[in-house]
Amino acid sequence: MKQKKVKKAGLRKGGFTFKQFFVAHDKCEMKVGTDGVLLGAWAPITKAKTVLDIGTGSGLIALMLAQRAPQVERIDGIELDEDAALQASENAQQSQWSSLIHIYHHDIYQYAQQAPTRYDLIVSNPPYFEPAVACRNQEREQARYTKTLTHEGLLDSAQQLITDEGLFCVVLPYLIGEQFIEISQRKGWNVVQRVNIKDSADKPYHRILLAFQRQYQGETKPCNIEELIIRNNDGHYTTQFQSWVTDFYLYY
């Protein structure tokens, strides 16, 4: 007798369903992806009371951090693209953390001048392509290229907005992350945590997670370095990666 395939329960379209929330992203140029999930799952948040997500997009990282940290009192998301900001706000309002997450349609440079508070944790999954061939629309160009948010400007804005002992965390392609470290050191930041990421054991590093603290009076702090391998040689997720996402992904 021929067996019938068991269908998974229907999932909502136009976004990504996590265990405790849904992220609609059909109005966002940059969709839910592994980079954002990695940053949201890793960013050190246990001591934070106030959190800022720069370039929040769909609000994915803000929602993940809200789930991870019940002690947090405020999470603000800043987004330059109006449609994405509206969708992030809708995602937050439809979640169980609607009173915690606030989304602002704003330029981060202007926001840094008038922010209502300083932040214990600032996160960003920033654009990293240098301006080159124009994208098909302005919104996608903002999401992908450093034209409207340079790495120098991002570091300067974070420095204005962070608390004295706060952490600033980013996810970037590996080689661009190394360049980002050089820029950060010139601007008075210490790298205190980093995770070098490769897709499988036999592949080179392709992503990097970085956590920075402000440098005072030339002091340097030790950097804790880890490695994350996403897939085994058979293509399945490693136990290590599964442990990172088990609180979020439906089938882990």
From Swiss-Prot:
Alphabetized Gene3D superfamilies for the sequence: Vaccinia Virus protein VP39
Record GO terms (molecular function): nucleic acid binding; tRNA (adenine-N6)-methyltransferase activity
GO BP of this protein: methylation; tRNA processing
InterPro entries tied to this protein: DNA_methylase_N6_adenine_CS, SAM-dependent_MTases_sf, Small_mtfrase_dom, tRNA_Adenine-N(6)_MTase, tRNA_adenine-N6_MeTrfase
Primary location recorded for the protein, binned into one broad class: cytoplasm
Catalysed reaction, written as an equation: adenosine(37) in tRNA1(Val) + S-adenosyl-L-methionine = N(6)-methyladenosine(37) in tRNA1(Val) + S-adenosyl-L-homocysteine + H(+)
Record field: transmembrane: none
PROSITE patterns noted in UniProt: N6_MTASE (PS00092)
Record keywords, A-Z: Cytoplasm, Methyltransferase, S-adenosyl-L-methionine, Transferase, tRNA processing
Protein's cellular compartments: Cytoplasm
E.C. code: 2.1.1.223
Entry superkingdom: Bacteria
GO cellular component, one term: cytoplasm
Function: Specifically methylates the adenine in position 37 of tRNA(1)(Val) (anticodon cmo5UAC).
Family stated for the protein in its record: Belongs to the methyltransferase superfamily. tRNA (adenine-N(6)-)-methyltransferase family.
Name of the molecule in the record: tRNA1(Val) (adenine(37)-N6)-methyltransferase
